[in-house]
Every structure is written in structure tokens, then in C-alpha cells.
Amino acid sequence: AGRGWRRVVASPLPQEIIEIGAINTLVESGQLVIACGGGGIPVMRHGNHLKGASAVIDKDFASERLAEDLHADYLIILTAVEKVAIHFGQPDEQWLSEMTTDEARQYMAQNEFAPGSMLPKVQAAVKFAESRPGRTALITLLQKAKDGILGKTGTRIYRA
């Protein structure tokens, strides 16, 4: 796409957020914490040290892991579209306001979501919603986040 050469590396699922204690302390003190941005380098423990790995952590799965570890009830994944769509870019395109985790799994099996784009967002949302009863994930546009939180837009993913 005119961006030159890119190195292909593994993208493992995050196993833990090493800084979770500090993040939790900040959250509990009322601070707004921005964490788990895209392109993070995963680390591995080697004795008392951490060593970087030749890999990159997916921001959606890292955010899901963080939300689970913080015992959050809601996970909001911000993206470039207002809602998740099936048949994206086709004449029968359909924007979804909500879907159960079972419906999401069915759409994923039908290859409705693009790998490296909407697919990891939906996968992370499903993982979060199924991790504990009562959890809901929201996927929406950054500029519509407030309306999404208020239930006016976005796609809600929940376990039925």
C-alpha cells in the first residue's frame, strides 16, 4: 500500500498485564488511565528481569485482558466506524446495534469480519462478554463514544 517493507512478527494473545497493580491503584484513586495502545511489545519474565519479544500485542486483546483484570463490567472498543456491520461494503450491508456472543460467533464462522480489522475487535468483545455474567462490550466510533455509552449508537455485544 505504498508504505514500504513491513516486518511480519507474531501477535500472541496477552497472558497478563504486568503493570496491573499500578493501573488498578490509579483507577481506584479516580484517575483516567490510558493503557494498552496498539503495537505494544510483549515481554517475558527471565528471572527477575523482563525481556522484549519479537512480537506485537494486539490492542483489542490487550484492552480485553485489562478490562478483565480490572473487574470491569463494560469494555468499550473505539474504531473507525459507528457500528459493526455484516455484509460490509455490499449492497445488503447491515449495521448492527447489538448481537449476542452466539450471533457474533456465527458471523465470525461466516467470515463476516475482516481479519486485522473488525475481526479482532469482535473476538475481544466476545471474550470479554463471556468472561463473567453481566458483562457487555461496546464497539463504536471515537466521536460517538458518549452516545454509545448512552445506548444511542454503537454495537453492544453481550452473552444471552
Name what the model sees in each region.
Residues 1-160:
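C-terminal catalytic "cap/lid" subdomain
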